[in-house]
């Protein structure tokens, strides 16, 4: 039964994403549906919030989450929907590449606690810029035995030194590709660089090689589209380089709305079909993204590996892996102070006007508790502290 449902689901998904009219209708409607669903969820959360006392005993790093190791915060694109070009222009971003010893320490600690998912994607930047990326992928997959190692890339450097082949051969779990569409002119406007051919060739080679190897890796092409989905679906490059390789393991999607990077991105930064996500109502509840700890290239540990406004060295930084373990940092007073601050309306700068906000709720807590039950001693400490 599950197999039949999966196949049916795939056929519906494929039909929508290869039919221009269907895709236009679905993604146009999704904007309004998602806004309705978010409002409903915010109302539900506000009526039955998770208390600090309940959260405290499940606040720390736990295996069902995703650890982010941002191997570099340097990018080779200047996307109009991303904060990277602005923080570089303002010279507020300290860039670098993660040394192998920092990466190894983070991965070893993550493997020791039973972590399943590792994301090599930085808050800003492209992981393929890191010349030591493949060594890190090899270590995480084949020596630390992390089950699900993934990364997001703009595909510009996939062809360099046959990176597309080596990622598949090393056993990467997933490659998520961020690209504009199938129009050179619009690509150059949105991504700010003239690498359309490099990206499209890299995508084609990755999909072709993955298919030849039996599709061991999941590939998802995420169109950050200024064009309507139908314009991309009907384009020659989509028909020649992407559509033939679509399968249950290889999928595409279009962007319903774009977040504002904590207020850094404004409607004037977007173009064409792009729409900005609406600002959520102020809820004094922590965000789920605070619990996906992110290790910066220099070893500093940050709550939230998703967004920044001016820098990734901000008030979301709560420690350094060179000085303390991830477990210690996740249980530290500094980390708890940031999380608990949400309950009194005190938020870090990046979080003040963030449209990516996703509040914790009862279901989230139940899932977290089911895989990481609190010890009696922790409950006693929580009662004493709170």
Predicted regions: what is each one?
Residues 288-290, 316:
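A conserved catalytic-core signature of glycosyltransferases
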Residues 5-6, 10-174, 189, 193, ...:
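Conserved alpha-helical substructure of the radical SAM core
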Residues 69, 73-76, 281, 312, ...:
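Processing junctions and N-termini across compartments
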Residues 295-298:
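Short, acidic, Ser/Thr-enriched surface-loop or helix-capping motifs
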Residues 50-54, 58, 63, 300-301, ...:
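Flexible mid-to-C-terminal extensions adjoining Fe-S/redox cofactors in radical SAM and related proteins
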Residues 61, 283-287:
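Short loop/turn motifs at secondary-structure junctions and domain boundaries
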């Amino acid at each position: 039964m599950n197999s039949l449902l999966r196949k049916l689901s795939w056929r519906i998904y494929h039909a929508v994403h290869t039919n221009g009219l269907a895709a236009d209708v679905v993604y146009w409607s999704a904007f309004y549906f998602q806004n309705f669903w978010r409002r409903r969820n915010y109302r539900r959360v506000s009526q039955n919030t998770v208390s600090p006392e309940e959260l405290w005993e499940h606040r720390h790093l736990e295996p069902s989450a995703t650890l982010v190791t941002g191997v570099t915060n340097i990018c080779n694109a200047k996307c109009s929907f991303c904060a990277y070009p602005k923080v570089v222009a303002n010279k507020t971003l300290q860039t670098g590449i993660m040394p192998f010893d920092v990466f190894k320490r983070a991965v070893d600690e993550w493997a020791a606690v039973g972590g399943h998912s590792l994301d090599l994607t930085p808050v800003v930047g492209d992981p393929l810029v890191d010349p030591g990326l493949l060594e890190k992928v090899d270590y995480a997959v084949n020596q630390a035995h992390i089950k699900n190692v993934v990364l997001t890339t703009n595909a510009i450097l996939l062809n360099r030194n046959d990176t597309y082949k080596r990622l598949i051969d090393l056993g990467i779990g997933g490659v998520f590709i961020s690209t504009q569409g199938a129009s050179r002119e619009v690509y150059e406007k949105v991504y700010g660089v003239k690498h359309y051919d490099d990206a499209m060739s890299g995508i084609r080679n990755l999909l072709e090689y993955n298919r030849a190897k039996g599709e061991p890796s999941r590939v998802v092409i995420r169109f950050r589209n200024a064009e309507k989905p139908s314009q991309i679906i009907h384009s020659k490059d989509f028909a020649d380089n992407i559509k033939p390789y679509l399968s249950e393991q290889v999928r595409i999607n279009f962007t319903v709305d774009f977040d504002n990077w904590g207020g850094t991105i404004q409607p004037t930064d977007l173009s064409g079909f792009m729409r900005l996500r609406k600002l959520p109502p102020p809820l004094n509840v922590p965000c789920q993204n605070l619990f996906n700890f992110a290790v910066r290239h220099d070893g500093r540990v940050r709550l939230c590996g998703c967004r920044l406004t001016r820098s990734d060295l901000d008030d979301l930084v709560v420690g350094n892996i060179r000085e303390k373990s991830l477990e210690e940092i996740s249980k530290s007073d500094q980390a708890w102070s940031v999380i608990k601050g949400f309950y009194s309306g005190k938020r870090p700068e990046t979080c003040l006007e963030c449209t990516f906000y996703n509040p914790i709720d009862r279901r989230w807590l139940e899932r977290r508790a089911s895989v990481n039950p609190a010890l009696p001693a922790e409950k006693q400490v929580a009662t004493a502290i709170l």
